A protein has these predicted regions:
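All-alpha amphipathic helical-bundle segments outside canonical DNA-binding/catalytic cores
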Residues: 59, 95-99, 116-132, 160
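Alpha-helical structural segments
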Residues: 14, 31-51, 59, 63-70, ...
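Short alpha-helical scaffolding segments that buttress acidic/His motifs in well-ordered protein cores
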Residues: 65-68, 82-85, 133, 137, ...
């Protein structure tokens, strides 16, 4: 039904809770939606948080790519829900993006820049590298209908994507 088409009564029925019980914890449907989006953002940030400064830079970045692709495999609906919020201009999430995503993004781009400066990986703009990883992994979830039509009948689409992205980013990042 989507956000607009879903009522608190439907949420209560689906969750197995009474409407008054839900309203005890949440002020309304908007509050539930923002809470869900925040939980999704925390889940999506976990793979980025796991980039280790003391690991092999190329392998750390490739492992991040694979973790993002695995999230695409496991949580395609959640990816689309979060993407829809961003596509709408992040009306509910802008403060949370600034407080949660921005500091982590700045920290990890500084780490990647350190690896670039040390000559551990090729010269890249760390911000655009992260954007590229997001777009090339989440595409398979966010545009699942398109991928399904264009690769109809093929098994292992995400396995093929994993091998392709590994090769692409390895070539890009090898000094």
């Amino acid at each position: 039904h989507g956000y607009r088409g879903t009522t608190l009564d439907q949420i209560a029925e689906t969750s197995g809770l009474s409407k008054p019980n839900i309203l005890y914890y949440f002020s309304g449907k908007e509050d539930i939606h923002v809470s869900l989006l925040n939980q999704l953002m925390e889940s999506w940030l976990d793979p980025l948080e796991r980039l280790k400064p003391d690991g092999n830079p190329l392998e750390e970045i490739l492992a991040y790519v694979h973790r993002k692709l695995e999230m695409t495999r496991e949580f395609p609906r959640e990816s689309r829900l979060f993407a829809n919020e961003i596509l709408q201009g992040a009306p509910r999430m802008a403060p949370h993006l600034a407080a949660g995503l921005k500091p982590l993004f700045d920290d990890k781009t500084a780490l990647i820049q350190h690896w670039v400066d040390a000559g551990d990986i090729a010269t890249v703009d760390p911000r655009h590298l992260i954007f590229s990883i997001w777009s090339t992994t989440q595409h398979y979830a966010d545009f699942e209908a398109q991928v399904g039509v264009l690769m109809a009948g093929e098994d292992g689409v995400l396995d093929g994507a994993s091998a392709y992205l590994d090769n692409m980013f390895r070539k890009l990042l090898t000094p």
